[in-house]
């Protein structure tokens, strides 16, 4: 039994593409960045905490279970861009991303309670130059409101991406190849 410790519909959709049956549970954790924590360490810590929280929360569901936690952050010049609090916050983020290359880090952890496997995937994403009116129009679609970095590559925000180097599915929220490899190591995946 696999538990996806996430309420993200994007992660659930991606995980279903691997072909492994799973159940979703919410993993409520404190997502505050710790002082001196790099973006890479931060995203890996959150993925691990989510997996552990999912494993603990699913104790009544199945004895033999794995829990998968994942987290994705958008980073530019070593600064993590989270989900925007309001339009001004989203505008600032999108202005910073405008015409620039940034990184998207996605970490995935799978735990069986006593065993833990983790991966970190880095993807470079380059944006076109954005005008103020493009940013305002994009905000009005509602899409940026709950997205790290204020954009969704799989949605309307994809039209701003001029180049991607790495895993598209990792930018969406779950790197398929790497997740399948983790599941294989934990004996639950379909082989390539």
UniProtKB/Swiss-Prot annotation:
The active site is at residue 71. Belongs to the Maf family. YhdE subfamily. Its EC number is 3.6.1.9. It comes from Pseudoalteromonas atlantica (strain T6c / ATCC BAA-1087). Transmembrane segments: none annotated. It is found in: Cytoplasm. This is dTTP/UTP pyrophosphatase. InterPro entries: ITPase-like_fam, Maf-like.
